[in-house]
Amino acid sequence: QAVESLVLRVRALSVWHATAAALTVAYTVWLAVRTTRDHFGLGTSAYDFGLYDQGIWLLAHGKAPFVTLMGRNLFGDHTSFILLPLVPLYWVVGSTGLLFVVQAIVLGLGALPVWKTAHMLLGSLPMSCVAVVAYLLHPALTYTGMENFHPDAALAPLIAWAIYAALAYRWGQYASAVVLILLVKEDTALFVIALGKIG
């Protein structure tokens, strides 16, 4: 039963689905390779990449995330609790390039709610693909991905997800997205208030 359902879903996919997926994967891989190469070529800096790397590394080793460069706790600067799920990854992958790979994947994931929103509003697979291309080619998205590492990068897919969920009346998903948005940074509460007008 589950296999038949999966086969039917795969058959329902079109060239537009495949194109959007391929472009998203290509963009994500390109961004991950480009940013890790820049990092290992000494193209990143202590602000802000080093702050997050040291803080997460300390948490992964059971220590308080006191960042020496700032002279205070990592979460004393911004309440970016969205970083906590990265701690177990530091147990497995010790490379500093991990943060750039995660950031590229997170930014790429935003293509999915963009696709779903466009398809829901326009009912057109080609236009949904165009929306994904517009998302991936947006200069702010690529700049965010290439300008060191920032937890704010998680806002791109989370905001897109929250907007989709609100427009689709999926309130459980909406609430989940809003909670995750609030975990990115303390000042996102202002955005969430505005987002409430949609919801």
Give names to the regions the model predicted:
Residues 2-6, 10, 191-199:
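Perimembrane helix-loop-helix junctions
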Residues 22, 84, 92-112, 129-132:
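Loop-to-helix entry region of an early transmembrane alpha helix in multi-pass inner-membrane enzymes
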Residues 154, 160-173:
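Membrane-interface transmembrane helices that cradle and orient dolichyl/undecaprenyl
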Residues 48-74, 81-82:
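Extracytosolic helix-loop segments that constitute the early lumenal/periplasmic catalytic or substrate-binding loops
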Residues 105-137, 156-157, 172-176:
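Transmembrane-helix signature of polytopic, membrane-embedded enzymes
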Residues 144-152:
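Short acidic/glycine- and proline-prone juxtamembrane loop motifs at membrane-interface regions
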Residues 16-46:
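Transmembrane signal-anchor helices characteristic of membrane glycosylation enzymes that use polyprenol
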